[in-house]
A protein has these predicted regions:
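Glycine-enriched catalytic-core subsegment of oxygenase/oxidase enzymes
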Residues: 69, 77-82, 86-97, 265, ...
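Conserved SAM-binding strand-loop segment of SAM-dependent methyltransferases
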Residues: 102-106
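N-terminal secretory signal peptides and thylakoid transit peptides that target proteins
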Residues: 10-32
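Beta-strand-loop-alpha-helix segment that lines the small-molecule cofactor/substrate pocket
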Residues: 130-178, 192, 426
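Predominantly a Rossmann-like dinucleotide-binding segment in NAD(P)-dependent oxidoreductases
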Residues: 58-62, 66, 166-172, 176-287, ...
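Short amphipathic alpha-helix with an adjacent loop that forms part of the alpha/beta core around
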Residues: 109-115
Length: 461
């Protein structure tokens, strides 16, 4: 359930002042006047020629590219920036580029000033996406949130519900969805070029740079003066600071902070599959993977999903298989009309249809086979659109997003169900999407939602 008032959004963390709480409640009350409006109506509150004011939570890494990407739109103003790291790779660089923006270390204090801006960019590590984004939507803010949408399946469902309840404009940061390559592949499927799709194989075969399949480091290191380590940990279990293992990038290898290789790349590579076939939620899945270390993600896995059939698939169900490991690719005999001399991309998807197969490389032009039936120079090509401008213009009532949370939520739920399956290899998990329940495996069900750190438990979890 989402909270009836903003009190439940405030982590019970010491140091959050009484005045700050009053400001938050006042802001929430003001935001409540717009909650019943749809996105286009809400944008008109600002006026026909209004500008979009944005705040960014997370300004390093993808936060930097998201912030500069959105701010490149001529009708966007950067009002506030927030990061737990004040170095020039994070808040310092953003402050230098946007000197008029208010600066924060604590996202909760930024939201105290919610009356100053209309939209929030969320580019924290995975485990903080939902706490920040849900609080922002509750205050009436549009949200652009990096992928994967959330850290748990339950959070992904709450994000969908909140976006619908509050009528916010939302977009997940799977930017490649807007690239010509992915849009073209989706168009080919929708045009019936290869007929009904019988099966799908998706894979990620490159080596990540973060730690995998290893024990958590022991001991602790001095916390740098420019890093607010407790704020970085947020809702995650409290851990000692270790140089080079968590912040700023290697958090991606640890279960408490990330969603592993499947969560990180699945929202990109499976995206054109979902979009082309109009998939929703799987009904069952089985994973193959080595036993996990207690804290880190595996270095290889295969997940077999089964989805209900759609208008673009053959039969009552459609199998989709995910593979990740260095150098991995799907079995050639399963890929239909693709000739043996064709070198599969390092990462991507193959959709096997009645009349041919489509290869969708990760960020490269798709190919259709057999090539004699699909001459490349005669195939339609869709243009690239700007994923960031699309969201900004949708907030102003001038466009619609293509990766709103009503779409990104089920996609994220799917990849996160796969990460649960990886915990229980060779065991089929049966999924009831409506009930948000793994019906045949009580231990696996416990991972659908995870507890928050003591003192950081919002009521909607």
């Amino acid at each position: 359930m989402l909270p009836p008032d903003s009190k439940s959004l405030q982590p019970k963390q010491k140091g959050f002042s009484r005045a700050s709480r009053r400001s938050f409640l006042k802001t929430a009350a003001l935001a409540g006047t717009a909650i019943s409006l749809n996105a286009l109506q809400y944008s008109r509150v600002y006026g026909a020629n209004s500008r979009l004011g944005v705040a960014s939570v997370g300004t390093g890494g993808k936060g930097w590219s998201d912030l500069t990407g959105v701010a490149a739109s001529s009708d966007v103003d950067v009002i506030a920036i927030c990061d737990i790291d004040h170095s020039m790779n994070h808040l310092g660089r953003a402050a230098e580029k946007y000197p008029a923006a208010k600066q924060y270390s604590d996202w909760r204090k930024l939201l105290d000033q919610a009356q100053d801006f209309h939209g929030v960019l969320v580019a924290t590590p995975d485990f903080m996406h939902a706490p920040v984004a849900l609080a922002a939507m509750h205050l009436g803010k549009h949200v652009f949130c990096e992928k994967p949408l959330t850290h748990t399946v339950h959070e992904a469902r709450q994000m969908q519900k909140a976006a619908a309840k509050y009528g916010r404009v939302t977009q997940m940061g799977n930017q490649i969805q807007s690239h010509s390559a992915y849009r073209t592949a989706v168009h080919w499927v929708h045009q019936g070029m290869i007929g009904k799709v019988k099966e799908v194989h998706s894979w990620q075969g490159t080596r990540p740079t973060w730690p995998r399949h290893c024990p958590r480091p022991k001991g602790n290191d001095p916390i740098p003066a420019h890093v607010h380590w407790d704020l970085w940990q947020g809702v995650a279990p409290e851990r000692p600071y270790k140089v080079g293992f968590y912040h700023p990038f290697n958090w991606r290898g640890w279960q408490s902070y990330s969603t592993g290789q499947l969560g990180d790349f699945g929202c990109h590579i499976l995206d054109p599959v979902f979009k082309a076939l109009e998939l929703t939620s799987p009904t069952r899945l089985t994973a193959t993977a080595p036993a996990l270390y207690p804290d880190s993600w595996t270095d290889r896995a295969t997940v077999h999903y089964e989805f209900p059939g759609t208008q673009y698939t053959l039969g009552p169900s459609i199998p989709v298989t995910w593979y990740d490991a260095v150098g991995i690719s799907p079995p050639r005999e399963r890929l239909g009309n693709i000739p043996s001399e064709y070198a599969l991309p390092a990462s991507g998807s193959v959709l096997v249809g009645e009349k041919g197969s489509i290869v969708i490389p990760h960020v490269a032009a798709p190919r259709a086979f057999p090539e004699e039936n699909f001459p490349a120079d005669q195939l339609p090509v869709m243009p690239t659109v700007d994923h960031y401008t699309q969201w900004a213009h949708a907030c102003l009532g001038k466009d619609e997003t293509t990766s709103g949370f009503e779409y990104a939520g089920p996609l994220t739920e799917t990849v996160l169900l796969g990460t649960i399956g990886i915990r229980y290899p060779q065991q089929e998990l049966i999924w009831d999407a409506e009930a948000l329940k793994i019906t045949n495996h009580p231990q696996a069900q416990e991972w659908v939602s995870e507890p928050y750190r003591n003192g950081w438990e919002p009521a909607w979890v």
